[in-house]
Amino acid sequence: QKPRRIPVLSVSSIIKKPTWLSDEEYGAILDGTYKNRGRGMTDLRYGIEINTAVFTKAHVNGFFTEYGQGLVGHENDFEGSVKGVAESGGLSVINHPGDWLESYVDVNHAHEKKNIELFADILKKYPSCLGIEAFNRIDTVTCADRILWDELLSAVIPSGRNVWGFANSDAHVLSDIDTSFMDFVLPDRTEQTVRRGMENGTFFSVGRRAVYELGKDFVGEGEYPTVTRITANEDEQSISIEGKNYNRVQWISNGKIIAEGEKIDLIAASQNIGCYVRAQLLGKGGICLTQAFVLDDGNMHEVTLRNITPQQRKIELAEDKFKSTRFYVLGQEISREIAYRKRRRQEKKK
């Protein structure tokens, strides 16, 4: 039986014809005789990308909820989807924020306090919004999303919660599969166990490509770097990593590499450490990110990103509302396309 499609996808299928499973393939999946890769698979029901059919790519992933199915999105509106998922009892993740920020064009967009504040406020307000994608597909439009993640960690952790970094192949086509994914550490593969793993951050995010960390021409192949053990030594004030398929380990805090090697001495590195540290393992197969380890010396305090008056904020909200109208956004997209084509022509002339 062919799946029910909402009208927008029905139109898109005219442009790009879908490839259906044959009756034999579908039957083999149902009776368990389909080709076996030797690994199990967990079907996470009720997962969907929300706030779609928008030009601005303000997408949110909803998990363990039916909220958002068939709903037409609103331009530049992350919070509406996050709120809807929260009220339905599900979990959410902010998708490819760099695609919305266009930080792949200008990395400074990932450092702008207004942009950081927007996502930080959502994360503080909705605990069910677990974090952002640190990797998406082949890391083109999301190459600065680790930079934004570090900014958010510094802004949000002092408020009392962590921000998980996710990875997603966003597989619209077969070639996207295995480009970005998460490596979970779980006692079993039940739906509820996966949910707890997402909530607790018991997973590592892997990317086959990482433009800033590995170079724009690098493509990971073969076995990817993985973490097999993490040891936090309270007496030594150190964290050590064990793993496989890597040739370098880097430690990051406040968006900067502060140490290298399988072990970090937190006291020796204290001058460069903020409220967290995270590790990344690099190898021939790509890059593997740990979640952030929160470091609290007792002096942690809430972060205020911008000091603006209520009147300034009111004006800003009115401007943002206007910039989220379809009329404005359509004009913006046309201008961006013209600028993009101009850049391409200039690059070809060089």
Predicted regions: what they are:
Residues 1-109, 127, 133-149, 166-172, ...:
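A metal-dependent hydrolase metal-coordination microenvironment
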Residues 85-87, 123-128, 270-273:
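Flexible, charged surface loops at secondary-structure boundaries
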Residues 119, 124-133, 212-217:
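Catalytic pocket-lining loop regions of alpha/beta-barrel enzymes
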Residues 22, 112-121:
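Cysteine protease catalytic core and zymogen-processing segment of caspase-like enzymes
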Residues 33-35, 119-123, 154-156:
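Short, flexible, glycine/charge-rich loop motifs used to bind or transfer phosphoryl groups or to couple energy/partner
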Residues 2, 156-165, 169-348:
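C-terminal functional module detector
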Residues 120, 147-155, 184:
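Surface-exposed substrate-engagement region within the catalytic domains
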Residues 104-115, 177-187:
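Short, surface-exposed, charged loop/turn segments at secondary-structure junctions
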